[in-house]
Amino acid sequence: MTSRDLRAVLTAILLGTAATGAAALVLAAPAQAATVSAKVGPLLKEAQALIAAKNYKAAMAKLNEAEAVKSTPDDTAIINQFKGAIAISSADPNTPGGAKAKFAQDYNAGKFKDVIADAEYLRKNNVFDAQSQLIVAQAYFKAGDHAGCVRYTKTIPQSDTALELQARCAYEANDEATQRQAYEALVARSGKPEYWKGLLKLGERSRGLSDHNTLDINRLRLLTGSMGGKDDYIALAQFAIQFTFAAEAQAVLEKGVAAKVLTDDRSLRLLARAKQDAAANLANEAKNLAAANAAPQGDDLIKIGENMIGEGKAKDAIGVIQNGLKKPLKDPNNGQIRLGQAYLAAGQKAEAQAAFNKVKTPEKDAMVAHLWSLAARR
């Protein structure tokens, strides 16, 4: 019996099992025109028949007999390959190949709790790789153990796939803190719009948000490329108009029109209104700025600076907002966030992060400032 013949036998055996890729695992060595000895050949044929009958114990006994009479390196190689085939076919978890086979069979059979338990066999056989760890995490999810999934995904390498699963399990487990942490990690790693969508949706659900906080979250959707469609453009524009930031609303609506998202009459009427209001604001800007400079408090300067950001004059806005911060403010946090927003719009990311990071309380303002800071790291 040649090595090539034996490889064909082994392939047939392995393809009859549920161990995906098992043939490739065992038959990695190249075929060659070698033969096994006369005493070993018949024993291997008997072992083949026993394996086909799934009598693995008897097949192993035959291989042990062959082991006792082997006389060539080819004998040893083929016997070892047969043993590997038995380990995989029988899903013997005490061998590397068998542990992998049992793991795959249990997952394919939907035995997700067994998959979780199989991880210990993979560890013992030193074959518990990153892909297997992700499969265990998926098994926790499919078994409905979402809290267990959260705990487990925190112990494995934090790949994008692991973090995505962690966020999903955290959502199912009502663990908003972990969900936020997972999305923040994903945003920091790649900044993909889908990750920003998840993170900003969480931010939007936070309690006690002011309209200004909500405006900022909508601004961040536009900035991070995570706008969902027409409603997001309209919402951002309407909030901007509410705060008299008409130039910003105009820019947002024009982007929606350019993207062919805003084509209806209502959107076009809103754009016309924004253009009209923006022109009026610009005409009065010098007068309003002089009055704000003369005022004892700095809130009007902060607002004018915020409007200037929307007009595309971020560098000018920085100085105006800084002057506002030198005076008493009703809302110091807003002033600090606006300074960071102006720096970011001007391309000064380090200064923007420093400004955002000064906002510590209350939680709603600190959360929004933190989101801005994450955007400044892009």
Identify the residue ranges that each predicted region occupies.
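N-terminal leader/linker segments that initiate helical-solenoid repeat arrays
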Residues: 8, 22-112, 364, 368-371, ...
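Generic helix N-cap/helix-start motif at coil->alpha-helix transitions
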Residues: 36-43, 74-78, 90-101, 111-114, ...
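Residue at a conserved register position within TPR or TPR-like alpha-solenoid repeats
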Residues: 50, 87, 106, 140, ...
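Alpha-helical repeat scaffolds
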Residues: 62-65, 91-104, 114-121, 146-157, ...
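Flexible internal linker/loop segments at domain or repeat junctions
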Residues: 265-307
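C-terminal soluble interaction/assembly domains
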Residues: 297-378
